[in-house]
Amino acid sequence: MSNQACFSNPGPELWNALGWHPSSEQLEQMIALQALLRQWNARVNLTRLVEGGDYWIMQVFDSLWPLQSELQNAQQPRRCIDIGSGGGFPGLVLAIALPGARITLVDSVGRKTAALKAMAAKLGLTSRVTVRSERAEFTGQDPCCRGLFDLAMARAVSTAPVVAEYLVPLLKPSGEALLFRGHWSPNDAKDLAKALRLLQADLIKMERRELPDNRGVRHQLRLRATLPCPATFPRPIGVPAKNPLGS
């Protein structure tokens, strides 16, 4: 697995490394998503990672590896939300892999949400995928979203304290927040712990994973609320990023 050609049509070694194998229909949808990204990238800057291993490892594999438990119970009804969905990762890939899930995709860039809606329709996912064009701070205070999700996630959005402030208010009492991280250090952990005390949530899992083909190291962080999130969070638009909790 040393070059792009190895993943022009992924073989079983990729799925063996993941510990999950898509059905033929799911694989076709993932290949179709790749083609749609190529088309939309000509109009909207969604992602540069659309070819070969860039797509199959850096996008698909990286979106799914933290979700082992969910993948083993793929038909289970659950509500998920992806904040800062961008080109649809992890949200659209998750919608393909978890046929029992309803997925909400959130992005503040109108051109990206238009692309997400169009791609979801082409993939036959419209009945289970909702797209919202708005800032995450608004989503977290909207009664239609606040406190309603089994899984809230964000990938490549901001620092961990900022992302936690976006995600924790969205969780139902039994729900979990999933933060996709690259580098993770003791100082990062200290900063997140300060934020979680204010959000009344705990870090329940941290897992490190090396991507196939020497594509780098990733971490997943799982959070769970200990008490209802204080109504003041998330703070008004722009404040979480300018003044991260605990800083």
Swiss-Prot record:
Its main location: cytoplasm. InterPro entries: rRNA_ssu_MeTfrase_G, SAM-dependent_MTases_sf. GO terms for cellular component: cytosol. S-adenosyl-L-methionine binds at G84, F89, A136, E137, R155. It is an enzyme of class 2 (transferase). It is found in: Cytoplasm. Its EC number is 2.1.1.-. Belongs to the methyltransferase superfamily. RNA methyltransferase RsmG family. PANTHER family: S-ADENOSYL-L-METHIONINE-DEPENDENT METHYLTRANSFERASES SUPERFAMILY PROTEIN. HAMAP family: 16SrRNA_methyltr_G. This is Ribosomal RNA small subunit methyltransferase G. It comes from Prochlorococcus marinus (strain MIT 9313). The lineage of its organism: Bacteria, Bacillati, Cyanobacteriota, Cyanophyceae, Synechococcales. The gene is rsmG.
